[in-house]
């Protein structure tokens, strides 16, 4: 690198010791150049010298814009302990892969720090079954254990974790995965990857947990004796009735479905029952890295209060704690408890702009949701948005992402396709293609689209590809959707035309 060149260094500078800042300055001095400091503005004028950007504070889109102004790019390949979080470490690794694939030259200093992620990436490409979850995660329902929430079929039954490592059910799954044999419980990830999706839960979480646990190879799995990740779902008690959900995760939906005396409707809805669960007594605190509490709606469940008070009284508050919530009702008592957890983050379920969100997630009050999220942010708790893409919101996906940019700036968006009744509420069923294409064009100009969440970008691109093709929607499924949706509207006393008129106008395609 020459003295008169413009050099950009990439690193995580959010840790207390400002490691990236210090190292960039050192490299500039070694190359007899000038250290110009950190870039915080994409419009900043650039002259010869060494600059660095913080991989935490700037989005992928912003960094890509900045890179165009430089002669060379240097990755400050920090060891994982120098990153603010393992997620930033893995996101950086993915970003560098994208840069190289796009033709950017990236000069890497001491690349061995990230080489082990290449190992796991290669393994996942060769072994289409392998996933780290059976070695790191516990999801329990009344002593029944599942592999993850994408698969509710139990693999074993355990009343405590003493035999977790050698449990026959887990052992069968682990051995099959090591041999590359497909697992019946894991079809959700297989289906995603079958259409070219390389950001399935299997792929994403394996890379993430390899980083979190500093696993260098598959040979180290034999040393894992207890799970590091516990997912707790105390009950299906909930305070709203989401159209893309089922009675399994909302007792109100379960109650509503039971009251609808319509044989055709009953053949459509998911009837899987929720078993009451605890699970927190199984946690092995010596090894814990992450706990996720979902529902139902976590904030209306007394077990969440009990669990948090138990953690506080036992001084177990430093783990990575995630709570899934619809954000509608959060009590002052909960806000007081939240203050004790410094690594607490929230996953907010939100499916549209306020009016659309209130229709899809029936019982939601958008103003209360927004106020509660601002209060959480003021407490210093990061918020991620959990968005379910469906026929209800695909026609104005652009407006929705613009709203997210404005109302929740900087919050990552975890985008998923509908799971329950997914075939009849699919985002690929909207028959007026021009409406969707126009909205997709808006979506591709948002910060959300250019964020570091690969899954979000992939899903938007896949929808764009479908609606730009000559493929037709499945009108039989569309007809079934209107029947399903009309039944819910009739029970709830609302009308689709008052909330999503462009979808109501599509009724003409099936009548």
Name each model feature, range by range.
Residues 113-142, 146, 155-159, 254, ...:
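Radical SAM enzyme [4Fe-4S]-AdoMet core and its adjacent flexible, acidic
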Residues 8-22:
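Glycine-rich adenosine-cofactor-binding loop
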Residues 116-235, 241-264, 485-511:
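Flexible mid-to-C-terminal extensions adjoining Fe-S/redox cofactors in radical SAM and related proteins
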Residues 32-44:
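A short beta-strand-loop structural module common to alpha/beta enzyme folds
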Residues 23, 91-95, 278-281, 307, ...:
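A general structural detector for well-ordered alpha-helical segments in enzyme core domains, enriched
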Residues 50-63:
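Glycine-rich, highly charged phosphate/nucleotide-binding loops
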């Amino acid at each position: 690198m020459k003295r008169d060149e413009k050099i950009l260094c990439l690193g995580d500078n959010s840790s207390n010791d400002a490691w990236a800042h210090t190292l960039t300055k050192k490299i500039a001095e070694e190359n007899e150049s000038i250290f110009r400091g950190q870039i915080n503005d994409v419009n900043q004028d650039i002259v010869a010298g060494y600059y660095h950007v913080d991989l935490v504070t700037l989005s992928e889109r912003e960094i890509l814009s900045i890179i165009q102004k430089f002669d060379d790019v240097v990755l400050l390949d920090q060891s994982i302990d120098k990153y603010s979080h393992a997620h930033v470490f893995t996101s950086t690794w993915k970003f560098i892969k994208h840069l190289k694939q796009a033709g950017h030259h990236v000069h890497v200093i001491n690349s061995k720090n990230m080489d082990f992620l290449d190992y796991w990436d290669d393994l996942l490409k060769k072994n289409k079954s392998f996933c780290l979850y059976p070695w790191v995660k516990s999801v329990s329902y009344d002593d029944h254990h599942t592999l993850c929430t994408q698969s509710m079929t139990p693999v074993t039954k355990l009343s405590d974790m003493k035999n977790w490592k050698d449990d026959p059910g887990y052992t069968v799954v682990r051995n099959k995965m090591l041999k590359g044999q497909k697992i019946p419980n894991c079809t959700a990830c297989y289906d995603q990857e079958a259409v070219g999706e390389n950001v399935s839960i299997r792929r994403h979480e394996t890379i993430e947990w390899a980083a979190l646990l500093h696993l260098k190879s598959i040979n180290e799995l034999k040393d894992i004796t207890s799970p590091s990740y516990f997912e707790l779902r105390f009950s299906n008690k909930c305070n709203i009735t989401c159209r893309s959900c089922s009675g399994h995760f909302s007792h109100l939906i379960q109650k509503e479905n039971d009251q609808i005396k319509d044989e055709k409707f009953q053949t459509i809805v998911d009837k899987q029952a929720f078993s009451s669960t605890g699970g927190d007594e199984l946690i092995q605190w010596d090894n814990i890295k992450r706990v996720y509490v979902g529902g139902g709606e976590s904030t209306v469940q007394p077990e969440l209060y009990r669990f948090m008070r138990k953690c506080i009284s036992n001084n177990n508050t430093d783990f990575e704690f995630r709570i899934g919530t619809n954000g509608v009702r959060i009590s002052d008592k909960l806000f007081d408890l939240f203050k004790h957890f410094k690594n607490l983050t929230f996953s907010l379920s939100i499916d549209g702009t306020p009016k659309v969100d209130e229709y899809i997630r029936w019982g939601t009050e958008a103003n209360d949701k927004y106020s509660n999220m601002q209060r959480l942010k003021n407490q210093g708790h990061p918020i991620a948005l959990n968005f379910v893409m469906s026929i209800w919101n695909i026609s104005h996906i652009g407006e929705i992402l613009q709203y997210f940019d404005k109302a929740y700036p900087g919050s990552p968006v975890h985008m998923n396709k509908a799971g329950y009744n997914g075939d009849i509420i699919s985002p690929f069923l909207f028959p007026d293609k021009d409406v969707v294409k126009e909205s997709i064009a808006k979506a591709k100009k948002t910060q959300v689209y250019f964020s570091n969440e690969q899954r979000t970008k992939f899903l938007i691109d896949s929808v764009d590809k479908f609606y730009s093709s000559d493929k037709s929607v499945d009108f039989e499924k569309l007809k079934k959707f209107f029947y399903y949706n009309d039944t819910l509207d009739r029970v709830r006393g609302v009308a689709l035309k008052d909330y999503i008129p462009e979808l109501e106008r599509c009724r003409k395609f099936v009548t």
